[in-house]
Amino acid sequence: LTTGLSSWFHNYGNLLLMLGFLLMIMTMIQWWRDIIRESTFQGFHTTKVYNGLRWGMMLFIVSEICFFFAFFWAYFHSSLAPNTDIGACWPPINIYPLNPFQIPLLNTAILLSSGVSVTWAHHSLMSNKLNPAIHSMTITITLGFYFTFLQMMEYIEASFSISDSIYGSTFFVATGFHGLHVIIGSTFLFMCLIRIIMNHFSST
């Protein structure tokens, strides 16, 4: 997938990228299938397995914090003391940044709202109320895909690209990485919604 993406960036076609995406999707589907079989139908997820999954999630979150720490470091390193190569000013000359009070502010509100709705879904599940959980999870997924759509529109309307100085690089890498997380999160939440609808719950 990484090699295919790099090849596509350098105009070598997207066949390898599509094959990588197909392989990743197949892996995700079969992994979800195995998790459902082992936990819901076979009862193989013991307390030790649950603890391992919790630790895995915590370590994953720590690794993501490190990722975004690096992105913010790059941004502040470049913006607080601009190099003479970019005119010693921030943003660089001929770079017209997006208005933070338009789509970025709306996307922030959407993400905060999705946090509220997914918390609603969690508390509904803990209270054994399936219908409110289904409704709130559907709202969360819809907000996630709406965020992705607005992010795409923001990229289309931007007057700069990823190759336009350090500003374009840090902007598109940081926001693109974040947008990728939203897409992956929305996909996983969609799988959770399917499991809620199919009543894949244990007695505990």
UniProtKB/Swiss-Prot annotation:
<feature type="transmembrane region" description="Helical">
    <location>
        <begin position="12"/>
        <end position="32"/>
    </location>
</feature>
<dbReference type="InterPro" id="IPR033945">
    <property type="entry name" value="Cyt_c_oxase_su3_dom"/>
</dbReference>
<comment type="subunit">
    <text>Component of the cytochrome c oxidase (complex IV, CIV), a multisubunit enzyme composed of a catalytic core of 3 subunits and several supernumerary subunits. The complex exists as a monomer or a dimer and forms supercomplexes (SCs) in the inner mitochondrial membrane with ubiquinol-cytochrome c oxidoreductase (cytochrome b-c1 complex, complex III, CIII).</text>
</comment>
<dbReference type="InterPro" id="IPR000298">
    <property type="entry name" value="Cyt_c_oxidase-like_su3"/>
</dbReference>
<comment type="similarity">
    <text>Belongs to the cytochrome c oxidase subunit 3 family.</text>
</comment>
<keyword id="KW-0496">Mitochondrion</keyword>
<dbReference type="GO" id="GO:0005743">
    <property type="term" value="C:mitochondrial inner membrane"/>
</dbReference>
<protein>
    <recommendedName>
        <fullName>Cytochrome c oxidase subunit 3</fullName>
        <ecNumber>7.1.1.9</ecNumber>
    </recommendedName>
</protein>
<dbReference type="InterPro" id="IPR013833">
    <property type="entry name" value="Cyt_c_oxidase_su3_a-hlx"/>
</dbReference>
<feature type="transmembrane region" description="Helical">
    <location>
        <begin position="133"/>
        <end position="153"/>
    </location>
</feature>
<dbReference type="Pfam" id="PF00510">
    <property type="entry name" value="COX3"/>
</dbReference>
<dbReference type="InterPro" id="IPR024791">
    <property type="entry name" value="Cyt_c/ubiquinol_Oxase_su3"/>
</dbReference>
<feature type="transmembrane region" description="Helical">
    <location>
        <begin position="56"/>
        <end position="76"/>
    </location>
</feature>
<dbReference type="GO" id="GO:0006123">
    <property type="term" value="P:mitochondrial electron transport, cytochrome c to oxygen"/>
</dbReference>
<keyword id="KW-0999">Mitochondrion inner membrane</keyword>
<keyword id="KW-1278">Translocase</keyword>
<keyword id="KW-0472">Membrane</keyword>
<dbReference type="InterPro" id="IPR035973">
    <property type="entry name" value="Cyt_c_oxidase_su3-like_sf"/>
</dbReference>
<keyword id="KW-1133">Transmembrane helix</keyword>
<keyword id="KW-0812">Transmembrane</keyword>
<feature type="transmembrane region" description="Helical">
    <location>
        <begin position="101"/>
        <end position="121"/>
    </location>
</feature>
<dbReference type="GO" id="GO:0004129">
    <property type="term" value="F:cytochrome-c oxidase activity"/>
</dbReference>
<comment type="function">
    <text>Component of the cytochrome c oxidase, the last enzyme in the mitochondrial electron transport chain which drives oxidative phosphorylation. The respiratory chain contains 3 multisubunit complexes succinate dehydrogenase (complex II, CII), ubiquinol-cytochrome c oxidoreductase (cytochrome b-c1 complex, complex III, CIII) and cytochrome c oxidase (complex IV, CIV), that cooperate to transfer electrons derived from NADH and succinate to molecular oxygen, creating an electrochemical gradient over the inner membrane that drives transmembrane transport and the ATP synthase.</text>
</comment>
<feature type="transmembrane region" description="Helical">
    <location>
        <begin position="171"/>
        <end position="191"/>
    </location>
</feature>
